[in-house]
Amino acid sequence: ILRGLVGSEMCIRDRNEVLRLTQSQVGYSYRAVVSYIDSHGTREVLYTSPSETIDNLDDPVQGEVTIIGEPKEGVTLRALSNSLSDEDGIASISISWETSKDGRNWVGVNSLSGPVLSLNQSLVGSQVRARVAVVDNFGIETNLYSQATRTVANVNNKPSGRIVIRRVGQ
């Protein structure tokens, strides 16, 4: 019987079984303990040296970012990131917005971050997407992107101001 000691956890395994490391073993070391009965009927116990501490392997962020709202001037879009998860835990999530005229080259929307974006005249004719930066509990940052919106449609704005008529000549 192979017994692996992981931190303070005892993992009892059958002969020739492999101990598969999981997230719960990160930060611990382990050793194998082998016990057997020798040919004289005496129980023998062998211990391996402790392993190095188990390092974390970056687990991918699961889920997707969704945009709610119609891509039209004057409308507010909302990026939803509540379906995101990471086996390493999530320390922080930040949302920013990007715009593109061609759907290939993306530029950050200046100084706008957070889950909402108000579509104004400067975004008309562009596609918009949300960029979500997820930092896990081990400090690894992963960027995810929403699907791009359709092109932001223009709204025919009412003219504003006043008309002044001046007489020219006599």
Annotate each predicted stretch with a short phrase:
Residues 36-43, 103, 135-141:
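Short, solvent-exposed loop/turn segments at the edges of extracellular beta-sandwich modules
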Residues 1-12:
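Single conserved hydrophobic/aromatic residue that forms the stacking wall/gate
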Residues 13-21, 103-119:
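Surface-exposed, flexible coil segments in extracellular/virion-facing regions
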Residues 57-67, 155-165:
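Proline-enriched interdomain boundary motifs that mark the N-terminal boundary
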Residues 85-96:
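Solvent-exposed loop segments of extracellular immunoglobulin-like
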Residues 45-56, 143-154:
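Terminal edge beta-strands and adjacent linker/stalk segments
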Residues 73-82:
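A short beta-strand segment in extracellular, disulfide-stabilized domains
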Residues 8-9, 94-101:
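Conserved aromatic beta-strand anchor motif in extracellular beta-sandwich/beta-rich domains
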